[in-house]
Every structure is written in C-alpha cells, then in structure tokens.
C-alpha cells in the first residue's frame, strides 16, 4: 500500500475553495456555513479552519482567483492590442468577461446578489474594484488612460455587472454570445461617450 500524498498549502486552499464554490452556487452565500464547506472536503474541521476562519475569507479568495483568471485571459490576448485601438481592445475583453461561462462566474453572480444585503460584501466589492482598476492600468501600462475618473469606472463596472447578472439570472448568455459584436459596439459607443 502506497503512502498518502500530503497536499500542499495551495492544493488544500484550492480544495476548500472548490467546496465553497459548490455550496455558494447551490445555497447562496448567506446560507453557506463553514460546516457545509468542510463536509465537501477531505480535510478535518481544524484543517479547514487553519486556512480560513470564516466564509467571507473564502469568498474573498475566490473573487481574487477570479480576477487572476480574468487577467490571464486578457494577457493571453495582448498580441491583439494595438496603440490607437485601446477602446476596441478593451471592449472586446470586457464583453468576453461579461459573457464568459467559467468556474468563477456563478460565484460572482451570487456575490453580486448578496452584496446588496451584506455590508461586508459591499466593502469587499469596493476593494475588488480598486484592484481591478490597478490591473487595467498595469495591463495597458501608461499607453491609455483607461478610466478618466472614478465615476466613469463605476458606470462601466455597473454596466458590465448588469450584463453578467442577465447572462446568468435571465439565462441570456447564449443570446449575448450570439450578439457579441453588437455588445462590443455598444461598449465602444458608451466608452467613447463617457471619455469625452
């Protein structure tokens, strides 16, 4: 009989986050308990609590992992980026983000739904927005002032989140994917209007 492989810290956190994701998608964040999450892992209660003290900490890591996933996707398309066509490039990337059907999207949808009733989630949302803005600036370096002010950034964030919610809650993802070009054109139009 072979020795049981000991999981690394990253593997254990990933196992916990995968369990949490399943429960959050099924029950919603407000009804998710640490006990639910622990039950979906191969770890002991103490083992899970060693890495995460509460569901909020796990959700925060899930949201950060989702941002890292999205940044990798954008970086993989940087060869399409051309100076002078920044708005078009960003519109394409933002529309892809809005309609992407990935592991993190249903969790993000639950996060958006729950943040209205949970002030701690709203604080996490504001923190994630700051990190997103910094990442956009980092991706394009100083070639392009992505968002001239916070009001513009807030508007574009709200616009994207409305499409993300509709994609999931209203099952509109397929319709949006079919009309992707129109969504990109709308995003370019909105961006150019608000950047004046």
Show which residues each predicted segment covers.
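Helix-loop "lid/cap" segments that line or gate small-molecule binding pockets
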Residues: 92-99, 107-117, 190
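Residues in soluble alpha-helical coiled-coils and helical-bundle/repeat scaffolds
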Residues: 53-57, 61, 82, 99, ...
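Helix-turn-helix
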Residues: 15, 19-57, 61
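Hydrophobic/aromatic-rich alpha-helical bundle segments in the mid-to-C-terminal region
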Residues: 122-126, 142-194
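Short, basic, alpha-helical segments at the C-terminal edge of helix-turn-helix-like DNA-binding modules
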Residues: 64-70
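Hydrophobic alpha-helical connector segments
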Residues: 61, 75-103, 153-160, 179-184
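Amphipathic alpha-helical packing segments from all-alpha helical-bundle domains
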Residues: 72-76, 100-109, 119-144, 154, ...
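N-terminal intrinsically disordered/low-complexity leader segments
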Residues: 1-11, 196
């Amino acid at each position: 009989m072979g020795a049981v492989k000991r999981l690394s810290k990253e593997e254990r956190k990933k196992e916990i986050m995968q369990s949490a994701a399943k429960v959050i998608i099924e029950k919603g964040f407000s009804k998710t308990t640490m006990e639910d999450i622990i039950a979906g892992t191969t770890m002991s209660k103490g083992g899970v609590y060693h890495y995460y003290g509460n569901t909020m900490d796990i959700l925060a890591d899930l949201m950060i992992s989702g941002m890292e996933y999205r940044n990798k996707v954008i970086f993989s398309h940087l060869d399409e980026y051309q100076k002078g066509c920044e708005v078009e490039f960003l519109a394409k990337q933002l529309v892809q983000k809005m309609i992407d059907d990935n592991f993190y999207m249903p969790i993000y949808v639950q996060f958006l739904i729950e943040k209205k009733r949970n002030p701690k989630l709203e604080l996490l949302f504001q923190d994630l927005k700051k990190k997103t803005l910094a990442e956009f600036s980092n991706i394009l370096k100083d070639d392009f002032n992505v968002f001239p002010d916070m009001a513009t950034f807030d508007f574009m964030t709200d616009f994207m989140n409305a499409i993300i919610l509709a994609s999931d809650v209203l099952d509109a993802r397929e319709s949006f994917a079919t009309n992707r070009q129109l969504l990109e054109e709308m995003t370019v139009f909105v961006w150019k209007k608000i950047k004046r």
